UniProtKB/Swiss-Prot annotation, chain B:
Belongs to the ABC transporter superfamily. sn-glycerol-3-phosphate importer (TC 3.A.1.1.3) family. The lineage of its organism: Bacteria, Pseudomonadati, Pseudomonadota, Alphaproteobacteria, Rhodobacterales. This is sn-glycerol-3-phosphate import ATP-binding protein UgpC. It comes from Ruegeria pomeroyi (strain ATCC 700808 / DSM 15171 / DSS-3). Residues 4-234 form the ABC transporter domain. PANTHER family: MALTODEXTRIN IMPORT ATP-BINDING PROTEIN MSMX (PTHR43875), SN-GLYCEROL-3-PHOSPHATE IMPORT ATP-BINDING PROTEIN UGPC (PTHR43875:SF12).
């Protein structure tokens, strides 16, 4: 952790860490502790008096059907995005791995969605699926499906799932391709000599050997789906119709900034905080336990 | 019958030809070593036999079948890779059983074969371990075990001992040879180490720059090298090459010394003399000005120059010998130890 | 490897091309939409092939007065804001993380581990988890509607620090010993030796952080009420809302295109560095 050869203590190291520590304290630790504190309060409608109510806000949340629905919805959303995005990336990376020359070209063409902001991704997809003008509703109409995600909750959820997954394919693709390319070629050749065909080789060898990457991406994708997708929801459905796409992170924003329920929103923030911490711990645990060759 | 026929093989990458008309006939049960410096094409040749590289022109036959178009899995071969290529996520037992499992051999038969191979290779205690828990030598044996259980027609070895330390290498070398003799499977073994080649092969194929320099038994290559390349490659320390002229059965060196010999060669030649074929002799024709002597215990290597010239020479003398720097020592070549080569083509001149 | 199944190669390329089509489709449609005039864009279905109005739309978007029905600054101004924010975040993060990692790795001082864990904690606090209180702090400090407010709260996260820490840990000890013999003090060592050795990592990280900064959405949304300070990524949402009343999809899509171009360009141009940085940061 510390280099064997190092400098002794003085004023200098304190000065060096000061900027980061300062900003961390002011903009991270303090607000986080404020959120925790506020989650124990209830303010009245005018913000004039506050009351310390211990865990009442949390109890209210747990009993709130809407909150629980939002929680369940978020889990569903996460799972769908992870499966769709990782599955597509796995298939694409598997094929790209077979291309001897040109793998880099395919990679270049695949990675640009990474650079697109989630909210823009949302905007693009909502444009493609615009009930009056969009190309997809037009095509769906020809097979008898009436598309209007402004009215249909399931369709709205489907739309945001696709937009979120589309954006993440690039990231997952990069990691899967890198993992596959780090498998020694001679291993695959040995399997071929042993008689394994392409599909068999993938199932018996390639997939098991990239399992650390799969674990890693699961956590990353979960965190992405929980938090980075705010922009997509905000741009595409604003949580609607009828709250059918209100995921947890959107609810925090909505209840807090729009609904001005500070205590409830703070409590939601705290719960989200606990979730992130849990996911981060899992991530670091798994990275320590990398499969060795 | 698992003989192997290499018929006029050419390998090219785009416009660059890396193997030029390689040909040879390998008999059933032979242990053939393909040897040469890095980049000479030996691994490429092996991989072509395995089916891991395409053939640009020519044919490869295993037994009676032409195998050019066949997938590696269909050629009935087994290969031991330089880095062993063991499946890291499978146990030793599973590694060895994998190829058999795919060919849908019965579980009993698989178990029997795996146990048999494990006995031969002394891998019994390790059957349930994973590769990362094994030492280099053990992993090597697992790689061989994987090849043995398949009962293939041909074994292919791609520099399997390069990753082992020197002592282990010598030990494993012997084991591979004994194993092959016991099993009697036709084998092709690739290495850049000429000592390995000499000790392992029934016959050696020396490759240089994609060309076959010579294909024969180790002793043939040692006694009658076909080119200066083979002459300099086989035998350590390497053969001395001296510019000379030949006429009427004798050879005259650049410094005027004359060596009697037989033969009809004449004109400028390159004379090859092995360091171990020069005997100390007061009146001998080959006079060397000493630079330094390396003491190896069993023999001594004398480094110097041919007197009166700049040509470097090495002489190997038995036992402990020493000589002062700048002293001149005289030697006589032993009988039949003169090798004459054409100075331009490098090819052996018939005597 | 010899695989006498050419059909498999065909399938491989087909699948990959299909993948690229799916990935590129939204962007293609956006591009096409940006090249037609407003009237064409109100007729269903929207066109799939480019039109001829690219430059017209381009100039109108860039220099026009913003879309009717929105409260956004002119697009060129928003691009500038985005650029300023992205650069400040990227450069700020790199600078702070470099010196922090240097201190943590190369100095033995009291509270060293405490600081390390403090920085680590920030990994678990993305902005979405602390939006309200952070907003309050920023407001109290009077940093709303400013470039500082847009960037400072986002530059202390730990990923960059961890990456540099990892890089520094792999630099051989002999470097420092030899520098000391040469008479270099800590800051000299840092500037003359450590930073040049970390160049590729800094470049890779810059790509990732620039994109991160440029694409910020929730935070700028909250703290800018002044139209002059809107960023281009923020404005997309407002334009979508405006589209309800008076759809000018060609302008909206052109704006979206402009909003996408800089990060995409940076990623593609520095692809190799970016991939290397990505696969090494998140470990």
């Amino acid at each position: 952790m510390l280099k064997r050869v190092h400098f002794p203590s003085s004023l200098l190291p304190y000065l060096l860490v000061a900027p980061q520590i300062l900003i961390t304290l002011v903009f991270f630790i303090w607000p986080a502790s404020q959120a925790v504190y506020q989650s124990f309060l209830i303010e009245d409608a005018f913000g004039l008096s506050t009351e310390f109510v211990w865990f009442e806000n949390f109890e209210l949340l747990i009993e709130d059907a809407q909150y629980l629905q939002s929680f369940g919805r978020t889990i569903l959303f996460s799972a769908a995005v992870a499966v769709l995005s990782m599955g597509s990336a796995l298939i694409l990376a598997g094929f790209a791995d077979r291309v001897v020359r040109g793998a880099t070209t395919y990679r270049t063409l695949m990675i640009w969605p990474y650079a697109v902001a989630p909210v823009l991704a949302g905007a693009l997809w909502v444009f493609m699926f615009n009930p009056t003008l969009g190309i997809f509703p037009f095509l769906l109409d020809m097979v008898g499906i009436d598309w209007n995600h402004y009215l249909n909750g399931t369709q709205a959820m489907t739309l945001v799932i696709f937009a979120a997954a589309w954006k993440q394919i690039a990231y997952n693709f990069l990691f899967y391709l890198a993992a596959m390319q780090s498998i020694p070629r001679s291993l695959i050749e040995a399997a071929a000599i042993d008689g394994a065909g392409p599909v068999r080789r993938f199932v018996d060898h390639i997939f098991p050997l990239i399992s650390p990457t799969t674990f890693f991406l699961l956590v990353i994708n979960a965190v992405y789906a929980f938090f980075d997708t705010f922009g997509i929801i905000h741009a595409v459905t604003q949580g609607g119709p009828a709250n059918s796409t209100t995921i947890l992170v959107y609810k925090v924003y909505n209840d807090g900034f729009v609904g001005l329920d500070l205590g409830g929103s703070a409590a939601q923030s705290v719960i989200l905080m606990i979730l992130v911490i849990a996911m981060t711990v899992v991530q670091f645990r798994f990275i320590e336990r990398k499969v060795e060759y | 019958m698992a003989s192997i026929t290499l018929d006029n093989l050419v390998k090219a990458y785009g416009d660059t030809e890396v193997l030029h008309h390689v040909a040879g006939q390998i008999e059933d049960g032979e242990f053939i070593v393909i040897v040469g410096p890095s980049g000479c094409g030996k691994s490429t040749l092996l991989r072509m036999v395995a089916g891991l590289e395409t053939v640009t022109a020519g044919q490869i036959s295993i037994g009676d079948r032409v195998v050019n178009q066949l997938e590696p899995a269909d050629r009935d071969i087994a290969m031991v890779f330089q880095n062993y290529a063991l499946y890291p996520h499978m146990s030793v037992r599973e590694n060895m059983a994998y190829g058999l499992k795919i060919r849908k051999i019965s579980k009993d038969e698989i178990a029997r074969r795996v146990e048999e191979a494990a006995d031969i290779l002394e891998l019994r205690p390790y059957l349930d371990r994973k590769p990362r828990q094994l030492s280099g030598g053990q992993r090597q044996r697992v790689a061989m075990g994987r090849a043995i259980v398949r009962n293939p027609q041909v074994f292919l070895f791609d520099e399997p001992l390069s990753n082992l330390d020197a002592k282990l290498r010598v030990q494993m070398r012997l084991e591979i040879r004994k194993l092959q003799q016991r099993l009697g499977v036709t084998s092709i073994y690739v290495t850049h180490d000429q000592v390995e080649a000499m000790t392992l092969g029934d016959r050696l194929m020396v490759l240089n720059g994609g060309y076959v320099e010579q294909f024969g038994t180790p002793i043939e290559l040692y006694d009658r090298p076909a080119t200066t390349f083979v002459a300099g490659f086989i035998g350590s320390p390497a053969m001395n090459f001296l510019p000379a002229t030949a006429a009427e059965g004798s050879v005259t060196l650049a410094n005027g010394a004359r060596i009697a010999g037989s033969g009809t060669a004449h004109g400028t030649v390159t004379l090859g003399l092995r360091p171990e074929h020069l005997l100390p002799d007061e009146g001998g024709p080959v006079r060397v000005r000493v630079e330094l002597v390396e003491q190896l215990g069993a023999n001594s290597l004398l480094h110097g120059q041919l007197e009166g010239t700049d040509t470097e020479m090495v002489v190997s003398m038995p036992g402990h010998m020493s000589a002062a720097a700048d002293a001149v020592m005289a030697f006589t070549p032993t009988a039949d130890s003169l090798h004459l080569f054409d100075p331009e083509t490098g090819k052996r001149i018939a005597e | 490897m010899v695989e006498n199944r050419p059909i498999l190669n065909v399938i491989t390329h087909l699948v990959l091309i299909l993948g690229i089509v799916i990935v590129a489709l939204p962007i293609w449609i956006t591009f096409v939409a940006a090249t037609h005039d407003a009237v064409r864009m109100t007729q269903a279905p929207i066109p799939m092939l480019p039109g001829t109005h690219f430059w017209e739309n381009f100039t109108q978007t860039l220099f026009g007065s913003g879309l009717s029905g929105t409260e956004t600054a002119p697009v060129w101004r928003m691009l500038l804001n985005s650029l300023a924010m992205a650069m400040m975040i990227a450069l700020g993060k790199i600078a702070i993380s470099l010196i922090s990692a240097f201190a943590i790795v190369y100095f033995k001082f009291p509270f060293r581990m405490f600081f390390f864990w403090l920085i680590f904690v920030t990994l678990m606090l993305p902005v979405e988890v602390r939006i309200l209180p952070t907003f309050e702090v920023v407001a109290d400090l009077g940093m709303l509607n400013s470039y500082w407010g847009l960037s400072i709260p986002l530059i202390a996260s730990a990923t960059a620090t961890f990456m540099f820490r990892q890089v520094f840990l792999t630099i051989p000890d002999e470097m420092l010993e030899s520098a000391r013999i040469d008479g270099a003090g800590p800051l000299r060592f840092f500037w003359d030796i450590l930073i040049p050795l970390s160049r590729t990592n800094i470049a890779a990280l810059f790509v990732i952080l620039f994109i991160y900064g440029w694409n910020q959405y929730l935070w700028p949304l909250l703290i800018t009420t002044d139209t002059d300070m809107t960023t281009i990524v923020m404005s997309i949402k407002q334009m979508l809302e405006a589209a309800e009343q008076s759809p000018q999809w060609n302008i909206i899509m052109m704006t979206a295109l402009l909003a996408m171009l800089p990060p995409v360009f940076v990623v593609v141009a520095m692809q190799k560095l970016f991939v290397q940085g990505l696969t090494e940061t998140d470990k």
